Amino acid sequence: MDIIFVCTGNTCRSPMAEALFKSIAEREGLNVNVRSAGVFASPNGKATPHAVEALFEKHIALNHVSSPLTEELMESADLVLAMTHQHKQIIASQFGRYRDKVFTLKEYVTGSHGDVLDPFGGSIDIYKQTRDELEELLRQLAKQLKKDRR
């Protein structure tokens, strides 16, 4: 299964989700290909220093280069998980024919319509809060994918 996590600039939430989920999926024995992109990302940007630090505390390296969301990525994905409802709307307007595989992360995992906190410009504590929120959601995602695999 190919999963893409999407946020705005692909420097905070979606790369954190990608790195966290790769770690969780490996521990859980899930066969997934995980990537991330941004709806307004510039190519080849770096993850924010606070995002790197927040994951380093969990012993997860964040060696990331930002990538814009493209037609090619959308076509190859089985599941596209946006960080906010607004991201989902932008994706639907730009890539309408793929809308059936686009959800917010919270919508897909919990059925709720909430957004993942945007830490951009915030303190390291805000990044840790976002990391912890993502980690909990991604553990639930792994459980759901394992259950669906049966």
UniProtKB/Swiss-Prot annotation:
Phenotype on disruption: Cellular protein arginine phosphorylation is only detectable in a ywlE mutant and not in the wild-type strain, and global gene expression is significantly impacted in the mutant strain. Cells lacking this gene are impaired in dephosphorylating McsB-P. They also show a reduced resistance to ethanol stress.
Family matches, as InterPro entries: LMW_PTPase, Ptyr_pPase, Ptyr_pPase_sf, Tyr_phospatase_low_mol_wt
CDD domains noted in UniProt: LMWPAP
Sequence positions that bind substrate: T8, G9, N10, T11, C12, R13
Keyword annotations: Hydrolase, Protein phosphatase
pH curve summary: Optimum pH is 5.5 with pNPP as substrate.
The keyword Ubl conjugation is assigned to this record: no
Site residues (Important for substrate discrimination), renumbered to this chain: T11
Catalytic activity: N(omega)-phospho-L-arginyl-[protein] + H2O = L-arginyl-[protein] + phosphate
Hydrolase in keyword set: yes
Name of the protein this chain belongs to: Protein-arginine-phosphatase
Origin species: Bacillus subtilis (strain 168)
Classification of source organism: Bacteria, Bacillati, Bacillota, Bacilli, Bacillales
